Amino acid sequence: MARPPYRAEQRNQIFACFINAASELMENEGMESLTLRRVAKRAGYNSATLYNYFKDLDHLTVYASMKYFEDYNRNLARYLADEQDAFQRFLFMWRFFCASAFRHPHAYYNLFYGKYSGELTEIIHAYYEVFPEELGELDDSVLEMLTCGSLVERNWQMLQ
């Protein structure tokens, strides 16, 4: 007899387990160490289970790369809190973005230029549905910018 389907909360927990396992492997052993089997083993699941949540390793890698934005989100909100001028906020956001991107180039490349960059808006929304605490305390304009998928959309959002 087949197992009953997982509830949404259980699916989100398993989804988070895989993302956390992949993120830990990326952080501790580098991108080259990332395989579906290693991620599944670290998460405590069969590698076939991963395909219920991710299309392939690249898809999982994009989600795991989102972990690098946690510090970025928190610090960006803190630094932008006192600046009211939209252009100055825009310039600061880009300086901060570039500094973060140079610290984790593989993660930023995967997100904005990788195989699934065209799906980034959907990926961002799905990710923050499971990890809402990583957004921190953001004002509405920064929150809207962070949930845009493309860099063009992010720029437009910050300049409005």
Language-model-detected regions and their locations in the chain:
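Basic, helix-initiating cap at the start of DNA-binding domains
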Residues: 1-42
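HTH DNA-binding helix-turn interface
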Residues: 5, 26-31, 44, 51-63
